[in-house]
Amino acid sequence: MMEYPNQSGFRQRKLLPQVRMRGSAMEPSDPTQLFDDTSSGVNKHEPGRVGKSPDVFSGQNLLSDPMSNLAMAYGSSLASHGKEMMDKNLDRFIPISKLKYYFAVDTVYVGKKLGLLVFPYMHDNWEVNYQQDTPVAPRFDINAPDLYIPVMGFITYVLVAGLALGTQNRFSPEILGIQASSALVWLIIEVLAVLLSLYLVTVNTDLTTIDLVAFSGYKYVGMIVGVVAGLLFGRTGYYLALLWFCASIFVFTIRTLRLKILSEAAAEGRLVRGTKNQLRMYLTMAIAAAQPVFMYWLTFHLVR
């Protein structure tokens, strides 16, 4: 506050504006202050102490609590144990690791395998290659069974069947579902019948159920070609294509399975003689002869 004389000789006082620096605390008596100034980061009630959020202390206390650490360790152990049990039980019913082997294919393998299914007459070596008592992946051996071609063949067969039914104005989702279900049921019946026959004949073979599914699914290639030929060239084209692929799948199955079913006699260097070995030979021929029957049964009604 300053005093200066005026013309009348009296002194007048001039009030200077009160300036508050930014960041300084305001007096409690300031009527214009609505909230406490916390921008300085200093606690009013505890001068000189840096203020921290209570959440930080609660998080640190939680991490340093022995009971919390014990609960976290127990939860992690329980989760890992549950995952291990789930993988073990899942692998018991669905052998995921084995299925990966049957889908280890590439474009070169698929092309060669399809060519072998179309024309198997000039192929000489039908033995599956092994590496340390384990069969090599299908992409390295054309004789190894795979599931890629059978699975894609089944899906393509259902689509081609829907196309054939559509050209005849007989298509409906229900009929297509029945077509796919019947093909799947016949495949399951075929595999179960072969397994039962192998058990009754007491064949000592390394054939697995997945191998039988693969060999039974190769016939879908000929079925697809037969139906497409029927759509393009009529029933004559259908019968010609089906006849060719029936003969091809018969030769392919005979030459593939005889090394599996008759492997015991072949390993001992014995000829296929005796009642037991003759039963195995007849079983091999029966499995091969069943392929053309299923091919005709599942396709003849699709071509008119």
From Swiss-Prot:
Q: Which GO annotations describe the biological process of this protein?
A: cilium assembly; endoplasmic reticulum to Golgi vesicle-mediated transport; protein transport; sperm flagellum assembly
Q: Which UniProt keywords apply?
A: Endoplasmic reticulum, Golgi apparatus, Membrane, Protein transport, Transmembrane, Transmembrane helix, Transport
Please name the taxonomic classification of the source. Answer: Eukaryota, Metazoa, Chordata, Craniata, Vertebrata
Q: Which residues cross the membrane?
A: 147-167, 183-203, 213-233, 237-257, 283-303
User: What's the protein called, per UniProt?
Assistant: Protein YIF1B
Regions of compositional bias (Polar residues) in chain numbering: 30-42
Where found, per UniProt?
A: Endoplasmic reticulum membrane; Golgi apparatus membrane; Endoplasmic reticulum-Golgi intermediate compartment membrane
Known function? Functions in endoplasmic reticulum to Golgi vesicle-mediated transport and regulates the proper organization of the endoplasmic reticulum and the Golgi. Plays a key role in targeting to neuronal dendrites receptors such as HTR1A. Plays also a role in primary cilium and sperm flagellum assembly probably through protein transport to these compartments.
List the ranges whose topology is Cytoplasmic.
1-146, 204-212, 258-282
What GO terms fall under cellular component here? Answer: COPII-coated ER to Golgi transport vesicle; endoplasmic reticulum; endoplasmic reticulum membrane; endoplasmic reticulum-Golgi intermediate compartment; endoplasmic reticulum-Golgi intermediate compartment membrane; Golgi apparatus; Golgi membrane
Q: Species name for this entry? A: Danio rerio (Zebrafish)
Membrane topology label: Multi-pass membrane protein
Per the record, the gene is yif1b
Where does the UniProt entry say this protein principally localizes? endoplasmic reticulum
